[in-house]
Each structure stands twice: as C-alpha cells, then as structure tokens.
Amino acid sequence: MTYNIVALPGDGIGPEILNGSLSLLEIISNKYNFNYQIEHHEFGGASIDTFGEPLTEKTLNACKRADAILLGAIGGPKWTDPNNRPEQGLLKLRKSLNLFANIRPTTVVKGASSLSPLKEERVEGKDLVIVRELTSGIYFGEPRHFNNHEALDSLTYTREEIERIVHVAFKLAASRRGKLTSVDKENVLASSKLWRKVVNEVSQLYPEVTVNHLLVDACSMHLITNPKQFDVIVCENLFGDILSDEASVIPGSLGLSPSASFSNDGPRLYEPIHGSAPDIAGKNVANPFGMILSLAMCLRESLNQPDAADELEQHIYNMIEHGQTTADLGGKLNTTDIFEILSQKLNH
C-alpha cells in the first residue's frame, strides 16, 4: 500500500518546519519499510498571494483524496482583509472534511519541568489530552452579523454533535488512565446544559471511565494550580480553543505541542498548535518539535506505524531532556541542527 499525504507548508515558519519533517519521514519510511507519496499544495496566505483565496478547490479535492494531511502553519499580519484571511481557509477545510475532533496532547518531558512557568513540583510528569469539538459552536453558528452598532454570534449544539465528540473522549480516556473531565458553562448557557446532560447519558456506556464536570472558569484555574489532576478533558469549540492554548504553555513553549484533527472516517489533519511566527521566518531559529511530534501522531494514527512513532517521540524527549533544543527552550541549536541530529538518531 502507498499512503497519499498532502503537505500544506503554509506561511511564515511553516515551510521550513514541514519540509524538515518530510525529510525525517523519508528516513523513517525506509527504516520501517512502508511507501508514501507527497502532494504539495499552497494554503493560507501563500494561496491568497497566488490564487486569491486561502483554500482552492484543487487543494481541497486533494485533501479529500488523501490518507493524511500535514500542515505547517498559516497566517500573519500581511493578510488583513477580513473577508479573505488565511484562517478562513483552515475553517473551511475542517468543515469540508468534517474534522469534528481536535486532539491536543500536552506532556511535560522528564528533565524539562524547569522550562515551565509554573513550579516544577506542579508540572513534573504532567500528561493530559484536550479533546475539542471543532466544527460546531459559536465559530460556525448562524445567524451572525456585524455593524457599527451591533454584533451577533450564535452558539448552537445538537445532541448528535455532542455525542460524537464525547464518544471520542471516552474512548481515549478508557485507553489511558480512565479519567474524563467534561468542561462547560452549565450554570448560564443552554448549550452547556444539553452538553452536560449528554455527557452523563453517554457515560453509562463507559463504566470503566470516571467522569467529573467542571465549569470552564474553574477548569482554567485548575490547569494552573493543579494540572496533574487531569487525564482527558473534553469541551466545546470555544472553550477548547482557549483551554488548549493555556495548557500548551505549561511545558514551557508552544513549540512543543502537536495536534490532530479527524472525523469518523476520511483523512486526518496534523499540525503544530503554534502560529506562523513571521518575525522569525527564514532565520533558521524556529522550534520544529511541535511539527515533528505532529508527524509522530500521523505515523501512529494514519500510517499504521506505531513503532516508528514511538521511536521518533523518544528521540525528541531525549533531546529535550539533554538540552538539545532551540533557544525558546533554553538551548543553542538552530532548526537545521534539530533535523540533522534526529536524522542521525533515526539512521543509527
């Protein structure tokens, strides 16, 4: 079997971290004996510059045919038209592929807890995953309008939309430490009242998983005061957007966090959670670990290569533990150095 992978380098540091990761994929495929082919497509701001829109039909159709999609990063201050922004291409891609589940693991690597802005004893060994609903909620709700006197956004969830994301979270929790925290604003929002009701109903199908409910403001506090209490967190789109960014800084850098977005069937999208960092683009100083860890998720989930994913992750964790990092993590290596060291380790 030959896997079909679509590469979307995007903007800013996206091309350099994605292209380096693809060089690692070539080494890994030879080592673990699997075949793949790559289609490169412009996306985001780069696509706006070339084609006038962030996501062309050609690119979208290629993504629909793919087994997996690897995305570098998109966006930047260059693209200011509110009706034609790079981020709108990503929203359209998620909606078109029905990528309703976003998985964001956050791990504090052994020996790297000193990098965290929190006290080491609070974060040592922290390992949690946030499961975020990605294609409904206030980002997609209708009606919506904006003028100089009034603005309206709509927050809507159906039972089916809640059930499908909650099942993903329960299954993930069952495969880990068996604890699920559901986050809502049930004390004031009608959508959250339905959310909590559905979570309680679905929980009956997963007796091996312990469930607790937290209001979103309480959860944001506990992520800082006691992050190690969490295993899997599930939440709606807006809450997940905010909480996952909060959680991602606990290891010490946004550059350490990967993510995966998927539907019940069809291709999955893998990307680091950080932005395009246009201020450092092309300077060979970007931290590529988030992108490489996203590649590891792709190897495990879409390319059926769990051993390769484990090896790649372990090499990264060992590098971080021994201070072989870029400057944002206190190290002295540049982007190219990271890829060269990992290439040597994988070829060993």
Swiss-Prot record:
UniProt-annotated location(s): Cytoplasm
GO biological-process terms attached to the record: L-leucine biosynthetic process
Keyword Manganese attached: yes
Gene Ontology molecular function terms on file: 3-isopropylmalate dehydrogenase activity; magnesium ion binding; NAD binding
EC code: 1.1.1.85
CC annotations in GO: cytosol
Listed InterPro entries: IsoCit/isopropylmalate_DH_CS, IsoPropMal-DH-like_dom, Isopropylmalate_DH
Residues bound to substrate: 94, 104, 132, 217
Protein keywords: Amino-acid biosynthesis, Branched-chain amino acid biosynthesis, Cytoplasm, Leucine biosynthesis, Magnesium, Manganese, Metal-binding, NAD, Oxidoreductase
A family per Pfam: Iso_dh
Cofactor note text: Binds 1 Mg(2+) or Mn(2+) ion per subunit.
Chief location: cytoplasm
Catalytic activity entry: (2R,3S)-3-isopropylmalate + NAD(+) = 4-methyl-2-oxopentanoate + CO2 + NADH
Sequence positions that bind Mg(2+): 217, 241, 245
Similarity section: Belongs to the isocitrate and isopropylmalate dehydrogenases family. LeuB type 1 subfamily.
Subunit-structure text: Homodimer.
Purpose: Catalyzes the oxidation of 3-carboxy-2-hydroxy-4-methylpentanoate (3-isopropylmalate) to 3-carboxy-4-methyl-2-oxopentanoate. The product decarboxylates to 4-methyl-2 oxopentanoate.
Alphabetized HAMAP family for the sequence: LeuB_type1
NCBIfam families for this protein: leuB (TIGR00169)
Name of the protein in question: 3-isopropylmalate dehydrogenase
Organism: Staphylococcus aureus (strain MW2)
This protein's encoding gene: leuB
